[in-house]
């Protein structure tokens, strides 16, 4: 941009500003966002409140805009093309007004801290500072040209005053200076803020909160125990702070040789002088499976209390009903067994009576046949038992044994119940073994262990489990670096007593 401020140069200025804003809003699309064309607020501090009233007056009770088709919308690029940002028409403030309006709308649309939220906030800061610089540059150029013209006129008239009066300012100069004052009075850099939480040992602070100055929403605290602190800027940057080097004596620059040395921490370097890692939010890394998936700090009832309430209200009732069913089933089984035993005893008594009345010779022949048949069956069973494949014996492991209860539970679709019962039983056996001070697990414990392992393996293979993303809680600030210790204190050396000669 050249330093002349003629009509053609102002047009070039608008074209250049439009190209810069288009390049800056490639990712956030601020210059292409639509907004009401008829809305305009002269006071830059009341743009947000006036826009809320403007929308509320045109909305119904449900919050929907009445006659939305008739609402005329425009964009910043369209206004650039229509020439509505001419400096002679107060274009600097109009452009700042539209940029602030669109950025405010987008800031309240995106959640706090997101990438788009930060991009819109950066665009607002960049464009506001760009307009302030250009206002100042063009205003200075106008002042210089008008000053030259006024000097030449005053020299011709015989007045040799070199001062630049307000009467010499043109209408364009006044409009630009007025727009500059309005923008500079409204645009402010927000104070940085951080989260603070007080723990048992020390206070922990988070990184700087990325909240925009345009955001009128309340702070979304990650926890009710957190507080917000303002990070005040350092004003005395030019004055170097004194370091903990030497502590000079108060009486003289030359220390007294009889006193102990006043040198303290000569080689001390403060940790803040290094680029050390600061407090960051919790990142679990390889321990994601152990990380909590939800935060119970803001809840009235935690998971332990909910479990106790469930156990008292529902769990004990379920156990009571199950125990009643078991007792009834055992009673039915006992009654059935007693009836069967009575029938068998009656039949045996009848058979004994019939055999005693029969012929004894037939009984002798039958006994011989029975002994022969039993001997043959025993020989075949022994042959079948001794036929074992060595390959199967070599590949056999304790986990290969499958019980009938496992097959039945898989058929009924209740393997989780069998796993729970087995784990409870395993826990009880382990507790008894530890109380008896027995280190080696029993055979029953080993069988239960392999049983649970086998069932879980079958369930995982059947379900084809894949990795599922888990959202872990990160609302816990962690202090990465902590420096313990204290400043060493100079100890006074005891003076030696001089021996006086008698």
UniProtKB/Swiss-Prot annotation:
Annotated region (Disordered), positions in chain: 336-378
Alphabetic keyword roster: Bromodomain, Chromatin regulator, Nucleus, Transcription, Transcription regulation
Subcellular location field: Nucleus
Highest rank taxon of the organism: Eukaryota
An example Gene Ontology biological process: chromatin remodeling
Cystines in this chain: none
InterPro entries: Bromodomain, Bromodomain-like_sf, Engrailed_Homeobox_TFs
Bias (Basic and acidic residues) ranges: 339-353
Gene3D superfamilies noted in UniProt: Bromodomain-like (1.20.920.10)
PROSITE patterns registered for this protein in UniProt: BROMODOMAIN_2 (PS50014)
Any Gene Ontology CC annotation: nucleus
Stretches assigned to the Bromo domain: 19-134
Assembly: Component of the two forms of the RSC complex composed of at least either RSC1 or RSC2, and ARP7, ARP9, LDB7, NPL6, RSC3, RSC30, RSC4, RSC58, RSC6, RSC8, RSC9, SFH1, STH1, HTL1 and probably RTT102. The complexes interact with histone and histone variant components of centromeric chromatin.
Function of the molecule: Component of the chromatin structure-remodeling complex (RSC), which is involved in transcription regulation and nucleosome positioning. RSC is responsible for the transfer of a histone octamer from a nucleosome core particle to naked DNA. The reaction requires ATP and involves an activated RSC-nucleosome intermediate. Remodeling reaction also involves DNA translocation, DNA twist and conformational change.
Note: Present with 4460 molecules/cell in log phase SD medium.
Record-given protein name: Chromatin structure-remodeling complex protein RSC58
Species this protein is from: Saccharomyces cerevisiae (strain ATCC 204508 / S288c)
């Amino acid at each position: 941009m050249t330093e002349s401020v003629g009509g053609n140069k102002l047009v070039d200025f608008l074209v250049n500003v439009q190209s810069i804003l288009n390049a800056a809003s490639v990712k956030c699309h601020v210059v292409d966002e639509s907004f009401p064309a008829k809305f305009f607020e002269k006071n830059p501090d009341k743009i947000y409140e006036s826009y809320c009233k403007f929308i509320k007056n045109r909305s119904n009770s449900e919050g929907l805009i009445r006659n939305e088709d008739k609402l005329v919308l425009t964009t910043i690029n369209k206004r650039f093309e229509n020439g509505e940002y001419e400096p002679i028409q107060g274009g600097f403030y109009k452009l700042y007004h539209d940029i602030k309006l669109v950025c405010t709308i987008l800031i309240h649309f995106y959640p706090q801290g997101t990438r788009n939220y930060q991009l819109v906030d950066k665009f607002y800061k960049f464009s506001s500072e760009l307009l302030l610089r250009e206002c100042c540059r063009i205003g200075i150029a106008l002042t210089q040209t008008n000053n030259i013209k006024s000097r030449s006129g005053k020299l011709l008239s015989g007045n040799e005053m070199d001062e630049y009066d307000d009467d010499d300012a043109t209408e364009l100069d006044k409009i630009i200076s007025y727009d500059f004052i309005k923008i500079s009075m409204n645009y402010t850099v927000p104070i940085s803020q951080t989260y603070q939480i007080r723990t048992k040992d020390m206070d922990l602070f988070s990184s700087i909160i990325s909240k925009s100055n345009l955001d009128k929403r309340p702070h979304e605290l990650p926890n009710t125990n957190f507080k917000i602190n303002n990070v005040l800027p350092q004003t005395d940057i030019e004055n170097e702070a004194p370091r903990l080097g030497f502590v000079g004596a108060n009486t003289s620059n030359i220390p007294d040789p009889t006193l102990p040395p006043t040198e303290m921490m000569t080689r001390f370097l403060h940790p803040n002088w290094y680029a050390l890692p600061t407090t960051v939010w919790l990142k679990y890394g390889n321990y994601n499976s152990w990380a909590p998936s939800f935060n119970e700090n803001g809840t009235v009832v935690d998971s332990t209390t909910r479990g106790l309430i469930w156990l008292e209200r529902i769990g004990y009732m379920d156990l009571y009903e199950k125990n009643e069913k078991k007792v009834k089933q055992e009673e039915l089984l006992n009654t059935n067994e007693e009836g069967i035993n009575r029938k068998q005893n009656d039949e045996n008594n009848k058979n004994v009576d019939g055999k005693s009345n029969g012929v004894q010779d037939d009984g002798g022949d039958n006994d011989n046949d029975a002994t022969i048949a039993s001997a043959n069956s025993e020989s075949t069973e022994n042959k079948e038992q001794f036929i074992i494949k060595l390959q199967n014996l070599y590949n056999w492991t304790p986990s290969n044994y499958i019980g009938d209860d496992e097959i039945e539970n898989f058929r009924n679709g209740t393997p989780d119940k069998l796993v729970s019962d087995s784990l409870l039983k395993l826990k009880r056996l382990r507790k008894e073994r530890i109380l008896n001070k027995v280190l080696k697990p029993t055979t029953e414990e080993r069988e239960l262990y392999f049983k649970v392992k086998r069932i879980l393996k079958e369930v995982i293979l059947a379900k084809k489990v894949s990795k599922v993303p888990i959202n872990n809680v990160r609302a816990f600030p962690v202090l990465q670096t902590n420096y313990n210790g204290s400043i060493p204190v100079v100890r006074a050396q005891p003076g030696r007593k001089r021996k006086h000669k008698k």
